[in-house]
Amino acid sequence: MTKTMAEHISVMLNESVDMLVTDTNGLYVDGTFGRGGHTRLVLDRLDKGRLLGFDKDPVAIGHGKLLEQEDARFSIVQDSFANMAEHITNVFGVDRVDGVMMDLGVSSPQIDDAERGFSFMNDGPLDMRMNPDKGQSAAEWIATVSEKDMADVMYQYGEERFSRRIAKAICEYRSHTPILTTLQLSKIIAEANPAWEKGKNPATRAFQGIRIYINNELGDLEIGLEAAAQALKVGGRLAVISFHSLEDRIVKRFMKLQAKGPELPRHLPIRNAHLDIKFKTVGKAIKPSQSEVSENVRSRSAVLRVLERVSD
């Protein structure tokens, strides 16, 4: 594990790149550039290969532009990985690549920068957008959303079991005072949450749910997985690191469907051998080592899964 570009520590760096790079002269995609940790190691492994990076975050794009100037094999695009197909064609001039990498969720620099509005530990404007120039901020959403829809978002995307109680408290507070900062919201949630998990801030799940909704993270993930699989050459691999159960469930389900086909009723005279299966999963899910978790506690929930195209 290597500390790269400021304070961000890339999770399962060697494990993921070992799985990803199968051809040193191939074409690769990093769907989540961040601060370039995985990108730089991929470039180190490549000879004449090329790499295309994606990120929504303008700060990440700034780092990517610097790397573009350093290494002609690398290009960066400010967009969601869900839209990778058109950019692959535009940049590489082909529609198939040798590998796609996704390191999901919010990065350490985003969490630690109070001005971005992701943190419930440091006070800042309640924003939470990966790209602050697009879409509705968390503060704008909280000011207008119905109590029911707010509770549904925290429950579905944050798995917050006290979502209704928390949403009620937020709506009561906003009726007399605008909610504009992260600590303002965090305090309301903490006071409404009757059962704090040991070692976890009471606002963790609610903040996660709001952030995922504001950025359409799960919608982008579902589209991006499909786009990545379609973009792979035979022998090409999709490597995905997820950080919470909602993401991992989507990734696991998608890869299982691609590798095994749909679940069929037992009485049907059709078996997997009769299906046109184009992919296989590579090994079992990989989790960070104990030493990595000791060095970087944010890696503790990470899961790496890999899918490989075996035929057209």
Swiss-Prot record:
Keyword entries, A-Z: Cytoplasm, Methyltransferase, rRNA processing, S-adenosyl-L-methionine, Transferase
CC annotations in GO: cytoplasm
Example GO BP: rRNA base methylation
Molecular function via GO: rRNA (cytosine-N4-)-methyltransferase activity
Catalytic activity: cytidine(1402) in 16S rRNA + S-adenosyl-L-methionine = N(4)-methylcytidine(1402) in 16S rRNA + S-adenosyl-L-homocysteine + H(+)
Protein's UniProt keywords contain Amino-acid biosynthesis: no
Broad class of where this protein is predominantly found: cytoplasm
Superkingdom of origin: Bacteria
Record has Hydrolase as a keyword: no
EC category name: transferase
UniProt-annotated location(s): Cytoplasm
EC number: 2.1.1.199
Binding site for S-adenosyl-L-methionine: 36-38, 55, 81, 103, 110
Family: Belongs to the methyltransferase superfamily. RsmH family.
Known function: Specifically methylates the N4 position of cytidine in position 1402 (C1402) of 16S rRNA.
Protein name listed in UniProt: Ribosomal RNA small subunit methyltransferase H
Gene that this sequence comes from: rsmH
